[in-house]
Amino acid sequence: MAGSDLLLAGVLFLFAAVIAVPLASRLGIGAVLGYLLAGIAIGPWGLGFISDVDEILHFSELGVVFLMFIIGLELNPAKLWRLRSSIFGVGAAQVMLSAAILGGLLMTTGFSWQAAVVGGIGLAMSSTAMALQLMREKGMSRSEAGQLGFSVLLFQDLAVIPALALVPLLAGSADEHVNWLTVGMKVLAFAGMLIGGRYLLRPVFRFIASSGVREVFTAATLLLVLGSALFMEALGLSMALGTFIAGVLLAESEYRHELEIAIDPFKGLLLGLFFISVGMALNLGVLYTHLLWVAVSVAVLVAVKMLVLYLLARLYGLRSSERMQFAGVLSQGGEFAFVLFSLPASQRLFLHDQMALLLVAVTLSMMTTPLLMKGIDKLLSRRLNPADDTGEAPWVEDDKPQVIIVGFGRFGQVIGRLLMANKMRITVLERDISAVNLMRNYGYKVYFGDATQLELLRSAGAEEAQSIVITCNEPEDTMRLVEMCQQHFPHLHILARARGRVEAHELLQAGVTQFSRETFSSALELGRKALITLGMHPHQAQRAQLHFRRLDMRMLRELMPVHTDTVQISRVREARRELEEIFQREMQKESRQLDGWDEFE
């Protein structure tokens, strides 16, 4: 692809994403499906703006590579070892059972047994990119279902290696003699990567960090990720597996969070590019001519994988609600099918349009997953939050809540306990099923659901409640809820959790005045105790704390109009100097009144 063509393709990708993804999110079908639809629109079977799909699809696999690196950073070797039974137990069982059933069904439709074996293995794999993205969106990452799902995906990545080696054998094109010297060299190279990464990565990053130049640190991170991927590809292994191992090796390092911050923007853009490329690869010509076959095959593919996954989750001991999420999020075909089915040896096994039909089925199965997960969420909402006898709004009881709490993590739990201790009627909305089940065991009135859905808020009693407390982890969810409540429930008193000053500024701009910065009060309290240990009178330390709170809040409000402007840095420095001067004057005045107590809002 020429340079000008590449630039044009980049502009088209960005334009399609900017238009399609917000529309998809507004329609409630999720960003992933928005990317896929954008790809169909600009691809060769849509408006035809881009025709070189294979090259772009190969490049866009870097999105999965970056994602696996970040996942590796979140897992240390000890945690990975604890997952070994689910990786090699549930993961292996899922691949073998799904491949056997799907391969057998392919043989009944005219596939040779060799093509059916390759097809069954390819269809048994799930989309790592889509599954992990959806698990994060649904808050499943830290749940038991999410951990089991990740284990299955990791085994599938490991299974890529023997699957690629199997295809030439089935096609009858494998060498008669195995070059054991080459195999041994690859094993030694892989072992060298593990040992070198274990002992060299941290000193190298320590040296780079000592330069104090952030851009160099970002460049080193990109070099590590892309270098690991290239090295593994040269060995004939999965690129994603290589970057995952690099991430695990750095999971316990002091640079873990800085690495994640450096990689995250690239990961998001490249993942979007990957989903757009998958949409572009959808062959609508094959779909039109074999519509019935494709429709049935997609339905069978999703149903078989869901059934296998659900049964394995039951044997593993997951709760029924988590089984459905686990089965749904892994029910699609995956990106590995594009690699496996496109091998020259594979192309000799498939007849006529068989390969194209399988790829269309895989692509469409990926498009069903966001819709399937949306349906599962609604089903679980009805099951976990049963309707009352009147048949009116689901699961609303006669004693209407006074307060709705959105999010019941550690922050939300403290608020809920305080309100319940004072006999306040609360309703809690939480989208992590494991948290819902756990809190219900302790007597909390917690309900499963995504509070950014308007109907769910209505069902929770937002029209009758007096206040809503928003404790979401994601700032985007917080601001979406604020906007929704202001538009549809203007009577509600909105109280919100702010993770830092930037989010506090956004809340102030939105008109929310009742918010709490999650670490601010606890940091002030610890600072007050530090002043006492340094010899300050307890009353004076208390007054110092109150003065600082008042002045900091004043500065927060004054800086709110310019928090996104280029003048922010100079204004912050000016405000800091002013804060120090006022603080010194106040403390000199109050030093003569050690026993006084003031209240500041």
From Swiss-Prot:
GO cellular component: plasma membrane
InterPro entries in the cross-refs: Cation/H_exchanger_TM, K/H_exchanger, K_H_efflux_KefB, Na+/solute_symporter_sf, NAD(P)-bd_dom_sf, RCK_N
Location of the RCK N-terminal domain: 400-519
Localization in the cell: Cell inner membrane
Keywords from the UniProt entry: Antiport, Cell inner membrane, Cell membrane, Ion transport, Membrane, Potassium, Potassium transport, Transmembrane, Transmembrane helix, Transport
Pfam families linked to this entry: Na_H_Exchanger, TrkA_N
Spans traversing the lipid bilayer: 4-24, 29-49, 55-75, 87-107, 115-135, 152-172, 177-197, 207-227, 230-250, 268-288, 291-311, 326-346, 356-376
The keyword Hydrolase appears for this protein: no
Primary location group: membrane
GO biological-process terms attached to the record: proton transmembrane transport
Membrane topology classification: Multi-pass membrane protein
GO MF, one annotated term: glutathione-regulated potassium exporter activity
Quaternary context: Interacts with the regulatory subunit KefG.
NCBIfam families, per database record: 2a37, PRK03659.1
Physiological role: Pore-forming subunit of a potassium efflux system that confers protection against electrophiles. Catalyzes K(+)/H(+) antiport.
Family: Belongs to the monovalent cation:proton antiporter 2 (CPA2) transporter (TC 2.A.37) family. KefB subfamily.
The protein, known as: Glutathione-regulated potassium-efflux system protein KefB
Species whose genome carries this gene: Klebsiella pneumoniae subsp. pneumoniae (strain ATCC 700721 / MGH 78578)
Lineage: Bacteria, Pseudomonadati, Pseudomonadota, Gammaproteobacteria, Enterobacterales
